[in-house]
Amino acid sequence: MAAQIWYEDDGDLSVLDGKKVAIIGYGSQGHAHALNLRDSGVDVVVGLRPNSKSVEFAKEQGLEVKSVPEAAAEADVIMILAPDQYQKGIWENDIEPNIKPGAALAFAHGFNIHYGYIKPSEDHPVFMVAPKGPGHIVRREYVAGRGVPVVTAVEQDPRGDGWDLALAYAKALGALRAGAIKTTFKEETETDLFGEQNVLLGGVNKLVEMGFEVLTDAGYQPEIAYFEVCHELKMIVDLMNEGGLNKDRWSCSDTAQYGDYVSTVIDEHTRERMQYHLQRIQDGSFAKEFMDDQAAGAPKFKQLQEEYSNVRIEEVGPKLRAMFSWNNDAAKDADEANSFTGKIARAQVQ
């Protein structure tokens, strides 16, 4: 069955008339949501801790800023955009004690709702609008009159207006210009984690690292190995993004295509490992492991960060990336995105 997709005419901004929307967090997604909604005529307040470095950034953009409890107390819709591991504490300490009866809760990722770390009472609508792109792109596309696609879901709908709220929010974000795909909190969470762990990060990163090590261990120059297993990956991904697997194969030489078809690096054993990791996502084992580690001060996470930040390919990577002038433009994009909190990956209510 084809997915249901909504566009501009399917959302009604008037649904948000007379409602205040609190954006909790002003990181990568937070700044884009707050500014796009504000520019769409929505009454927006940003919720941050009083000592957050993001307070001044938000005020400089002309946004109203209050503490998280204050923002939650006056909002009709609360979009929580802090990292997964912090949302439970923010909910329990700052939002749940202050939230208005019947106020809607919104998320850009289903993790905490799906795994039960946040359990709103049944009188609160709960919906999700999850952009398929980083915040600075969401903002840039909105300003350009375009939009970034989103996936959207409704988990609780006590009044029957959950979808109206979700689509109105998506329209204010600029997302309906591109399209909003209907999903569920379960589907979004589990597929998102699966993609990260098995393909986008846990797959590609490890393929690149191992390919580099095999070539350099065999005596090839690190610089040449880097070009072959890392640099050229962008070309393939761009082709795939434009026209799928067929375009990326069609665009390569016959020799490259044949090598693709007969390669045995990814085989049924890989499928079995993917199925194992999917099971851990589905049964909550991965979520529990991650959240337990975070609650203990993240010792395993920090150990792994340190271990993987010192991989051999990064001994040569910075020098070679600097050879390509367009990487300087990419760095500017990253600086712009990071300027709100320091690091996209650490965007939080701090």
Curated annotation (Swiss-Prot):
Substrate binds at S253. NADP(+) binds at Y26, G27, S28, Q29, R49, S52, S54, D84, Q85, Y86, Q87, G135. The active site is at H109. GO terms for cellular component: cytosol. Its cofactor is Mg(2+). Mg(2+) 2 binds at D192, E228, E232. Its EC number is 1.1.1.86. Residues 3-183 form the KARI N-terminal Rossmann domain. Keywords: Amino-acid biosynthesis, Branched-chain amino acid biosynthesis, Magnesium, Metal-binding, NADP, Oxidoreductase. Pathway: Amino-acid biosynthesis; L-isoleucine biosynthesis; L-isoleucine from 2-oxobutanoate: step 2/4; Amino-acid biosynthesis; L-valine biosynthesis; L-valine from pyruvate: step 2/4. Involved in the biosynthesis of branched-chain amino acids (BCAA). Catalyzes an alkyl-migration followed by a ketol-acid reduction of (S)-2-acetolactate (S2AL) to yield (R)-2,3-dihydroxy-isovalerate. In the isomerase reaction, S2AL is rearranged via a Mg-dependent methyl migration to produce 3-hydroxy-3-methyl-2-ketobutyrate (HMKB). In the reductase reaction, this 2-ketoacid undergoes a metal-dependent reduction by NADPH to yield (R)-2,3-dihydroxy-isovalerate. Belongs to the ketol-acid reductoisomerase family. This is Ketol-acid reductoisomerase (NADP(+)). It comes from Bifidobacterium animalis subsp. lactis (strain AD011). The lineage of its organism: Bacteria, Bacillati, Actinomycetota, Actinomycetes, Bifidobacteriales. The gene is ilvC.
